[in-house]
Regions:
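N-terminal "arm"/small-domain region of PLP-dependent enzymes with the aminotransferase-like
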Residues: 2-65, 150
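Conserved core of the PLP fold type I
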Residues: 64-154
Length: 154
């Protein structure tokens, strides 16, 4: 018996377009007949990790264990360093993760999410995933039109 999992997904999720990464270095070299390519897309580091990072990873004894899911010690240190309360810190696997958590927690199909025309690519993705309406505000020159954004809030 087979199951089509896509048929079980919400309309917001099933309507998402899969992320298509840029071409690989090898593909660019082949297509453009280049010997060297430095890929700067996708927030990739062409230099690799620094020796300090490699040393820190090597020194970590518990790397094969799940980390503290609440990040208690990290939150405690961040709170102390930045003079914040621990409960005011949210940890995530990058901004994508945090934006997705916030959207799932607070945005419903009855909401409209307002964002600028040239803002972070994750805003439309998480908005669509929860089935909310998009409020895309055209750019003002090369910047955000904050007045138009404010007047669009309903």
């Amino acid at each position: 018996m087979s199951c089509d999992l896509f048929s079980l997904a919400t309309s917001g999720v099933s309507g998402l377009t899969p992320y298509r990464p840029g071409k690989s270095i090898e593909q660019l070299q082949r297509e453009m007949n280049l010997d060297e390519v430095v890929k700067l897309a996708s927030n990739e580091n062409p230099l690799g990790p620094s020796q300090i990072v490699l040393d820190a990873i090597s020194a970590t004894k518990d790397l094969s264990r799940y980390p503290d899911g609440d990040g208690f010690n990290l939150k405690k240190r961040l709170a102390k360093k930045h003079n914040l309360k621990v409960e005011n810190i949210t940890l995530g696997n990058g901004s994508n993760d945090i934006l997705e958590m916030v959207t799932r927690a607070f945005v419903t199909t009855n909401h409209e999410v307002i964002y600028s025309q040239h803002s972070f690519a994750v805003y439309p993705l998480v908005t669509q995933a929860v089935g909310a309406k998009h409020g895309v505000i055209p750019a003002n020159g090369w910047g955000h039109d904050l007045e138009a954004m404010l007047s669009s809030v309903n």
